[in-house]
């Protein structure tokens, strides 16, 4: 098992539901977390809320650049339309670090959610292009922000597909997934296959709407 208990995880988009929910769960599991936002005061306000909810002190809030510089591993949980520009502005701060991209390029119309076409192939591959000196992975696409935020749900019952071309980096991300009760990190292939994982989120949203659920996925026979 890869040791991750001493790592500090930065969350870009840490004031938004997905990033904030993962930060809450990691902090509750004993992982130090730093939230990133365009405004440091907004990030610190969110961090104060999570400290109270999780009953811990190891959550801080900084602006995005300071968050990226301070963390050992950085989760990208920002809106798709600002994805490229934000990562491009943080190239130096993210150099040499494991970056976990959980962004889903989706559109919505009267028929529901659908996957957008990404020039680079996927959000994760775009991150890889923009951050050539970082160790880019893709994971945490299929996690319900509602379930993450509800600490009364003690077992989230979910497999987290982890993609990437760096074995050590994907092992770290899998181990970070495993720290959250009910999560299991599962290697899901090379980064070039991330578009399939990102697009599947549209199907899960459709399932959730039809069945009034917070669906995830499980991989069998492993």
PLM features: what roles do these ranges have?
Residues 48, 88, 125, 175:
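Active-site phosphate/pyrophosphate- and oxyanion-stabilizing loops and adjacent acidic/basic residues
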Residues 53-60, 132-135, 183:
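A short helix-to-beta-strand connector/capping loop
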Residues 2-49, 179:
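NAD(P)+-binding Rossmann beta1-loop-alpha1 motif at the extreme N-terminus of oxidoreductases
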Residues 6, 44, 70, 96, ...:
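A glycine-biased structural micro-motif
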Residues 54, 58, 62-98, 104-111:
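Rossmann-like NAD(P)-binding element
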Residues 158-222:
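Active-site-lining helix/loop region of Rossmann-like oxidoreductase modules
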Residues 103-144, 150-152:
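Rossmann-fold NAD(P)-binding glycine/threonine-rich loop
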């Amino acid at each position: 098992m890869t040791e991750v208990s001493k790592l500090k995880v930065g969350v870009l988009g840490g004031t938004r539901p997905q990033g904030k929910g993962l930060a809450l769960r990691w902090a509750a599991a004993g992982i130090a977390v730093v939230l990133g936002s365009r405004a440091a005061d907004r990030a610190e306000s969110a961090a104060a809320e999570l400290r109270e909810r999780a009953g811990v002190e190891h959550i801080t809030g900084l602006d995005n650049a300071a968050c990226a510089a301070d963390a050992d591993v950085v989760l990208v949980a920002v809106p798709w339309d600002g994805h490229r520009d934000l990562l491009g502005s943080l190239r130096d701060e993210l150099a040499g670090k494991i970056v976990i991209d959980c962004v889903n390029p989706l559109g919505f119309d009267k028929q529901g959610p659908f996957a957008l076409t990404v020039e680079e192939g996927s959000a994760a591959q775009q991150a890889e292009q923009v951050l050539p000196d970082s160790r880019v992975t893709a994971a945490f696409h299929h996690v319900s922000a509602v379930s993450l935020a509800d600490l009364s749900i003690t077992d989230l019952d979910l497999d987290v597909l982890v993609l990437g071309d760096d074995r050590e980096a994907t092992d770290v991300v899998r181990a970070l997934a495993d720290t959250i009760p009910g999560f299991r990190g599962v290697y899901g292939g090379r980064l070039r296959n991330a578009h399939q994982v990102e697009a599947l989120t549209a199907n899960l949203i459709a399932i959730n709407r039809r069945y009034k659920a917070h669906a995830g996925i499980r991989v069998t026979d492993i």
